[in-house]
Amino acid sequence: MARILIVDDAEFLRMRISKMLLAEGYEVIEAENGLQAVEKYKTEKPDAVLMDITMPEMDGLTALKEIKAFDAKAKIVMLTALGQESVVLEAIKSGARDFVVKPFERERVMSAITKLLA
């Protein structure tokens, strides 16, 4: 089954998403900021990334750009809070395949991952 890198500075969200994905048979890798995300992407080579935009140390947009520079084919879905439309547009222009608005429903996350891996 596919390996998914979950990147969010909120531990409870990482745990919630991890439980969802593990229940569906996915392998999960976690990072708590963009800097860790870039490092783990390079070393763990996940099949997809689900990444928050607003994080300490390195934000999700910067991490997205660094990951895409390393691997142009990287499959990334961004997590965003309501009201960040301009940031979402920048993420899509920078190579994100989709976005999920927080708070989210399980079905929306699973739909985004399924489409990403199709």
Segments from the language model and where they lie:
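Acidic catalytic/metal-coordinating carboxylates
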Residues: N33-Q36, D59-T62
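Active-site beta3 strand of CheY-like receiver
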Residues: E44-L50
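C-terminal output helix
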Residues: S86, F104-T114
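Charged docking surfaces used in two-component/phosphorelay signaling
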Residues: M15-A23
